[in-house]
UniProtKB/Swiss-Prot annotation:
InterPro entries in alphabetical order: IQ_motif_EF-hand-BS, Kinesin_motor_dom_sf, Myosin_head_motor_dom-like, Myosin_TH1, MYSc_Myo1, P-loop_NTPase
Modified residues (N6-acetyllysine): K467
Designated name of the protein: Unconventional myosin-Ic
Domain named TH1: residues: 866-1040
Annotated positions of the Phosphoserine modification: S389, S517, S845, S1022
Organism of origin: Rattus norvegicus (Rat)
Length: 1044
């Protein structure tokens, strides 16, 4: 398998183990071996704290991975993370569970040696989760087997089934494994998983009948009640409320917020189908689970002889159906004990206490044997189907050990004794294999092996397991001997047999001071991890694990197929006393040690940061306790007994070669020689390092840290140089690219311009020749020779005309057209003028239109006829010269509803004497009204207005002629207005007398009264003068403004 040289971090930066050394003050070191004060437990824990604070939950002790449970999802187990760690050297990436998984897998593939990953730690430290993550990694990253992914799916789906039947909520962990598990995963020669096998150890079956306050029974009971279908529960005789079952209420913790039993049951049901459970097998399995609940609800009452009698007939009825046994047989087995004496079978009745004991013993036996059957069933499902093929021999095995860690509680009993004995054996194996691995590496590298002083816990293992004199042997002997054996007699036997052992102590053997901390029913062992005090109460009973013979006989007759396999009839004919629980556990543990010894080990030590299961909380007391019991300091001390750091020459030279001028930038010789030159330049002292065959060994972390600090400084310098070189290169390349592009563009553009210029010259020459020929023949009829010229002349005229069109209707300019376009030019001129007029007319407002119409009428009447007309042209006509407020209300009242269209102040001349008088001239729709102050002096209807006379001079007099026959009128009216042109134009329009305005040259005759006429004489002079002449005429002298 090929290595990938590097890996990318989440930010895209290459991350290696050494790259984090520069941040060691903030996040700690990634390998405890690099701790300067490696013997200090405080320094060890402080390094853990720093990393935990930064969400770095993994740290190495050499090849051993220490994991701290974060109690929250850190999003570090995604497919992206798996790819990041797959195929990468162990020290090329930060510490991670996947790094260990990949290293183990690559060793399995390349070295063809069986591997084992040992996961240990106390409950709630994350062992089960680590096992699941390892299986997930192998399922996602390993190649798929040729026959599909069935085995891979079964490996993954075996977990939820085993968790349902073997895990429970405890005070320390909501999903605590209550059994030890060792799983072998078989891989073919291609590295694909093809099979598996599971071994289970020491299921905590006492939990079936008893739970401490705040704890639960095994998950499967609650999952079935919460998630089972109504029909299934009815068939099993169950109801959903867990409070209805004695075995589920003792912990008083049926509901847990962090556990969803309903959804978990769906996962379990799906998993059962994946691992080849038939519907009948599922039904039989659920019947057994339900029978345990019903068994817990069996109650007894004492008869007159104090013998126990079953009082819950309904529960007994369900039990007989679910377990497939006879009701009377089961009743008798629960209330009597069968004794065989001298070949005779005797039934001894049980009292209430003994009956309850028998009931609970049956419940524990049924559940524990069902669990063992379940493991065997899963193993059959995981077994490789190619075991008989020749390629089977090429398979390799990877073992996963999820075992309970060292346990020290307030009250420690038989279970803790077995668990801690197991940890002693594993610690013994761990130290042995670690020292062996260290020694083999030293020898392979040609480095002298320095003997390591360490605590050999063989003395404790012998104390527990030695034949005849060990605790287990003494316990078995006490269980087997005739007579009244009790837990206290067992303790006395221990005191007599091993009283001189330095690691054993009881109340009787202790000094006065120590006795205060030991009860008379306790003994204390000094384990490798510290002292543990055990209570002997229940040791004999739990070791015997006694199930009365008639209960076995009853279960052997079961028609439930699973029960029939769990209780084999051969047990009844076997007269040999069954092995005790402790002996069985010792034998299985010795077998496990041999299995692990045959494999290449890897270690994962799990630590729980606090008891409250809260993220971000670091309980130093609790962690110090676990560091001690996991033997991590001892592990570190063994690892650091020689050299703290070792790396291949190639990797060391590649990382640090920039620190030496001779090795930078390229070393062409052997890597070993390059490293020798490098360390001499760095000033390493002989006692600080050793040169092996393929690796350099550095004794002290401070030597490595000094080198790393120098590298960080050197990197800054190199980074500056690289940046400068890169910028120079980058801008040079950019300049050259721009230059090449510019030359290319210039070349192309010059060619284009040249071609355009040549084409233009050719076109110009042809055009000039055609124009000259056309000009010569311009007067000839149209022909091919002059057509281009004529068209050019016409086009030029039209284009020039477009630029020289008249600006307005008064502009009469127009370009001179060529002879051929004269007619067209006139038509265009007419169209242009019409268009300008039309546009102008569309643009004027109604008010302006009225103004123009009045001006047009004034022009028609006065233009060229009256001297002062030109002065009135630029002056706008006003709609009225008097406002409403200037006209008397009495006048307005006299006019009634008639609107005033125009009003102007005038001067009226009397008919006799020509005396001037101020008046107002009002025009209505039907009459001319002359007003004096508040009185209407004269009203002239338009029908009686026969004409209007005015002189041709610049004066402002005019005469309104009325019909002589009108009796209402006294005669014509002589008036003077400063706005004579405006007044006469509006009067003529209102009275429809445009054609009745007379412009006289010398005099005007008007009717002065009945039978009398008056005359107004007009003469020109230097200034305006109006007087009565001696001849009785009205003489008007007016200056001449325009010569006509």
């Amino acid at each position: 398998m090929r290595y990938r040289a590097s890996a990318l971090g989440s930010d895209g930066v290459r991350v290696t183990m050494e790259s984090a050394l520069t941040a060691r003050d903030r996040v700690g070191v990634q390998d405890f071996v690099l701790l300067e004060n490696f013997t200090s437990e405080a320094a060890f824990i402080e390094n853990l704290r720093r990393r935990f604070r930064e969400n770095l939950i993994y740290t190495y002790i050499g090849p051993v991975l220490v994991s701290v449970n974060p109690y929250r999802d850190l999003q570090i187990y995604t497919r992206q993370h798996m790819e990041r760690y797959r195929g990468v050297s162990f020290y090329e990436v930060p510490p991670h569970l996947f790094a260990v998984a990949d290293t183990v897998y690559r060793a399995l593939r390349t070295e063809r040696r069986d591997q084992a990953v040992m996961i240990s730690g106390e409950s709630g430290a994350g062992k089960t989760e680590a096992t699941k993550r390892l299986l997930q990694f192998y399922a996602e990253t390993c190649p798929a087997p040729e026959r599909g992914g069935a085995v891979r799916d079964r490996l993954l789906q075996s977990n939820p089934v085993l968790e349902a039947f073997g895990n429970a909520k405890t005070l320390r962990n909501d999903n605590s494994s209550r059994f030890g598990k060792y799983m072998d995963v078989q891989f073919d020669f291609k590295g694909a998983p093809v099979g598996g096998h599971i071994l289970s150890y020491l299921l905590e079956k006492s939990r079936v009948v008893h739970q401490n306050h705040g704890e639960r029974n095994f998950h499967v009971f609650y999952q079935l009640l919460e998630g089972g279908e109504e029909e299934a529960l009815r068939r099993l005789g169950l109801e959903r409320n867990p409070q209805s079952y004695l075995y589920l209420v003792k912990g008083q913790c049926a509901k847990v917020s962090s556990i969803n039993d309903k959804s978990d049951w769906k996962v379990v049901r799906k998993a059962l189908s994946v691992i080849d459970f038939t519907e009948d097998e599922v039904e039989d399995l659920l019947s057994i689970v339900a029978s345990v609940l019903h068994l817990g609800n069996i109650h007894f009452a004492a008869d007159e002889d104090s013998n126990a009698q079953v009082t819950t007939e309904n529960q007994l009825k369900y039990l007989t159906r679910l377990l497939g046994v006879e009701g009377t047989t089961l009743r008798e087995a629960l209330t009597h004990r069968k004794i065989i004496a001298k070949g005779e079978e005797l039934l001894s009745p049980l009292n209430l206490e003994q009956a309850a004991y028998a009931r609970d013993a049956l419940a524990k036996a049924v559940y524990s044997r069902t669990f063992t059957w379940l493991v065997r069933k899963i193993n059959r499902s995981l077994a490789s189907k190619d075991a008989e093929s020749p390629s089977w021999r090429s398979t390799t095995v990877l073992g996963l050990l999820d075992i309970y860690g060292f346990e020290v509680f307030q009250h420690n009993s038989f279970e803790q004794f077995c668990i801690n004995y197991c940890n002693e054996k594993l610690q013994q194996l761990f130290i042995e294999l670690t020292l062996k691995s260290e020694q083999e590496e030293y020898e392979a590298e040609g480095i002298a092996w320095e003997p390591v002083q360490y605590f050999n816990n063989k003395i404790i293992c012998d104390l527990v397991e030695e034949k005849f004199k060990g605790i287990i042997s003494i316990l078995d002997e006490e269980c087997l001997r005739p007579g009244e054996a009790t837990d206290l007699t067992f303790l006395e036997k221990l005191e007599d047999t091993i009283k001189h052992h330095p690691h054993f102590l009881t109340h009787k053997l202790a000094d006065q001071k120590t006795r205060k901390s030991l009860d008379r029913g306790e003994f204390r062992l000094l384990h490798y991890a510290g002292e543990v005090t055990y209570s002997v109460t229940g040791f004999l009973d739990k070791n015997n694990d006694l199930l009365f013979r008639n209960l076995k006989e009853t279960m052997c007759s079961s028609t439930n197929p699973i029960m029939a396999q769990c209780f084999d009839k051969s047990e009844l004919s076997d007269k040999k006393r069954p092995e005790t629980v402790a002996t069985q556990f010792k034998m299985s543990l010795l077998q496990l040690v041999e299995i692990l010894r045959s494999k290449e080990p890897a270690y994962i030590r799990c630590i729980k940061p606090n008891d409250a299961k809260q993220p971000g909380r670091f309980d130093e007391v609790l962690i110090r306790h676990q560091v001690k019991y996991l033997g991590l300091m001892e592990n570190l001390r063994v690892r650091r007994a020689g050299f703290a750091y070792r790396r291949k020459y190639e990797a060391f030279l590649q990382r640090y070669k920039s620190l030496c001028p001779e090795t930078w930038p390229v070393w062409t010789g052997r890597p070993q020689d390059g490293v020798a030159v490098l360390v001499r330049h760095l000033g390493y002292k002989p006692e600080e390092y050793k040169m092996g065959r393929t690796k350099i060994f550095i004794r002290f972390p401070k030597t490595l840290f000094a080198t790393e600090d120098s590298l960080e400084v050197r990197r800054q310098s190199l980074a500056t140089k690289i940046q400068a070189a890169w910028r120079g290169f980058h801008w040079r390349q950019k300049f050259l690219r721009v230059k090449r592009s510019a030359i290319c563009i210039q070349s192309w553009w010059r060619g284009t311009l040249g071609r355009r210029k040549a084409a233009k010259r050719k076109w110009a020459a042809q055009t000039i020749r055609r124009l000259i020929r056309g000009f010569i023949l311009r007067h000839a009829p149209r022909c091919p020779e002059n057509a281009f010229f004529l068209d050019h002349v016409r086009t030029s005229f039209l284009l020039n005309l477009r630029r020289q069109l008249p600006r307005n209707v008064l502009d009469t300019s127009w370009p001179t057209p060529p002879p051929a376009l004269r007619e067209a030019s006139e038509l265009l001129r007419e169209l242009c003028m019409k268009n300008m007029v039309w546009k102008y007319c569309r643009s004027i407002s109604p008010e302006w239109k009225q103004q123009l119409q009045q001006k047009a009428v004034a022009s028609e009447i006065f233009k060229g006829k009256k001297d002062n007309y030109p002065q009135s042209v630029p002056r706008l006509f006003i709609s009225t010269r008097l406002g409403t407020e200037e006209i008397s209300p009495r006048v307005l009242q006299a006019l009634g509803s008639e609107p005033i269209q125009y009003a102007v102040p005038v001067v009226k001349y009397d008919r006799k004497g020509y005396k001037p008088r101020s008046r107002q001239l009002l025009l209505t729709p039907s009459a001319v009204v002359i007003v004096e102050d508040a009185k209407v002096k004269q009203r002239i209807d338009y029908a009686n207005l026969t004409g209007i006379s005015v002189s041709s001079l610049s004066d402002s007099l005019f005469v309104l002629h009325v019909q002589r026959e009108d009796s209402k009128q006294k005669g014509d009216v002589v008036l003077q207005s400063d706005h004579v042109i405006e007044t006469l134009t509006k009067t003529a329009l209102s009275a429809d007398r445009v054609n009745n305005i007379n412009i006289n040259q010398g005099s005007i005759t008007f009717a002065g009264g009945p039978g009398r006429d008056g005359i107004i004489d007009f003469t020109s002079g230097s200034e305006l003068l109006i007087t009565k002449a001696k001849n009785g005429h009205l003489a008007v002298v007016a200056p001449r403004l325009n010569s006509r």
